[in-house]
Structure formats: structure tokens, C-alpha cells
Amino acid sequence: MTRSDTLPDLPTVAEFVPGYEVSSWFGIGAPRNTPTQVVDKLNAEINAGLAAPKLKAHLTDLGETPLMGSPTDFGKLIVEETEKWGRVIRAANIKPERLIRGLR
């Protein structure tokens, strides 16, 4: 884990707790079978938007690190995160609970 560009003097949790690794990320998906040319166009426009200085600065001010990539990159991230957190959940024997009243 690397230090935040916004607060470079603030140590990461991993500097105090060896092996600590948690991050959050956001992504945009499209329905299955969306034509490749549509996905590629959306990806190019989203990457261009994230690279725009004004938006990039705003996201950075919010403590976010805008990352651009391809649909393949994002798919790999989803698989890696699912596998990693699946192992954690199984090792800790975490079971789902009904958290929201009325949700079944």
C-alpha cells in the first residue's frame, strides 16, 4: 500500500500492522453481451474523463486516486478481489445475516 498523494506524511495502516491490506475501488459495468465497440467507446470516454485535470484534481481532493484501465484490467481486478476476499470469508467462517428489515 502506498501513501495518499493528498496526505503524503500520513503513514498507512500497513506501516503499523504488517500484512494489512484493504482498499476500496469503484468501477462501471455494462450488461452482458453489450457490443465490444460500445464497451470500447465507453471505456475510452471514461478514461478521458478521469484523466481530465479538473476531475482528477477534484477526485484527489476527495482522497481518491483515479485509475484508468481496460475492461480486461477491470475483469481481472474483480476476479482477484473475489478470490482474495472469498478466502478471508471462508477462513473466518463468516456467514451472511439478514441485515435489513424486510430483506429476505
Regions found by a protein language model. Give the residues of each.
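Conserved, function-defining micro-sites of small-solute handling proteins
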Residues: 1-104
